[in-house]
A protein has these predicted regions:
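Short, surface-exposed secondary-structure edge patches
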Residues: 52-56, 221, 257
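Conserved hydrophobic positions within beta-strands
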Residues: 84, 170, 207-210, 243
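A short beta-turn/loop motif at secondary-structure boundaries
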Residues: 132-135, 200, 212-214
Length: 286
């Protein structure tokens, strides 16, 4: 278990071919403006000498960054079994069960995945979820262990470098076993949770392949090309195949929630930049 992360020291050797302002250098290496503010005073040194943000990094210089790591407040530790599908020094991925919120929020009852993670790290941790799943969606939730990794992973996800695959149980039988849903999504109205397909929405693309059907419902594998809120649920309802049991976009089934599982996540590693693939077993079928 890796949990002794109170301060993160990051050492970078400059491979730039010319002198670079220290702030630009840090931005080039994945630090956000917020993180740079944290290390502004006394948190950066070049070749062993503490410097200010006016300093210049020359080719071959050794830059040391000290990032203070805070502990999440207000998230109590609650012991629970965790299905850890990946862990190293920089991040941890858990197969979140169905009917569990990712983190505490208004309207979300305890326990949440965040409570379990805090217990896993003995309370000495900042909860940094990179992707989030709805309460009723199961599967891979990725969390960074330090501020630098969180910034690198979040930037990578914003650049579209994450590939997320899901399995879902949807209503009806498909004529075509493979398809792409390209339909923009926006909120139904201001302040509403529900989303709809609309011409003035944000670009949203979902690719799917039918695995099998039982004559009434179908099991589909889904690849997200974008990451809009409720994208899978909205898109499959839009084409007439809502998720079975989806109370918001389909037909409510008493004492049953929809089946949607994130079973694969592919991404560049925040430190090595090598592409890794994380998988989590799906517990449901037709």
């Amino acid at each position: 278990m890796f949990w002794e992360l109170f301060v993160e020291n990051i050492k970078i050797i400059s491979t730039n071919e010319k002198d670079t302002n220290i702030k630009d250098f840090l931005l080039q290496h994945g630090l956000t403006a917020t993180l740079i503010k944290k290390v502004k005073y006394g948190g950066v040194s070049i070749n062993g000498t503490t410097v200010t943000m006016r300093a210049v990094v020359s080719p071959g210089d050794e830059v040391l960054i000290i990032l203070p790591d805070d502990v999440s407040e207000g998230i109590p530790s609650i012991d629970m079994p965790l299905d850890i599908v990946y862990e190293d020094e920089y991040m941890i991925a858990v197969n979140k069960p169905q009917n569990m919120p990712t983190h505490p929020s208004k309207g979300n009852s305890l326990p949440t995945l965040a409570n379990g993670i805090m217990a896993y790290f003995n309370g000495n941790h900042t909860f940094r979820s990179i992707n989030r799943l709805d309460r009723d969606t199961s599967g891979i939730v990725l969390m960074a262990k330090d501020a630098f990794s969180a910034a690198a992973l979040s930037s990578s996800m914003k650049r579209g470098e994450f590939r997320k695959k899901y399995i879902a149980k949807v209503a009806g039988i498909f004529k075509n076993k493979h398809g792409v849903i390209d339909a923009p999504i926006r909120r139904e109205s201001e302040g509403e949770m529900k989303r709809i397909v609309a011409p003035d929405g944000k670009n949203a693309v979902t690719e799917y392949t039918v695995i099998r059907d039982d004559g009434q419902n179908s099991l589909v594998e889904i690849l997200l090309h974008t990451g809009r809120t409720h994208q899978i649920r909205v898109h499959f309802a839009y084409i007439g195949h809502p998720l079975v049991g989806d109370f918001l976009y389909g037909e409510r089934i008493e004492n049953k929630c929809y089946n949607l599982h994130c079973f694969e996540l592919s991404l560049p590693h925040p430190k090595t930049k090598e592409r890794i693939t994380i998988k989590a077993k799906c517990e449901f079928d037709l």
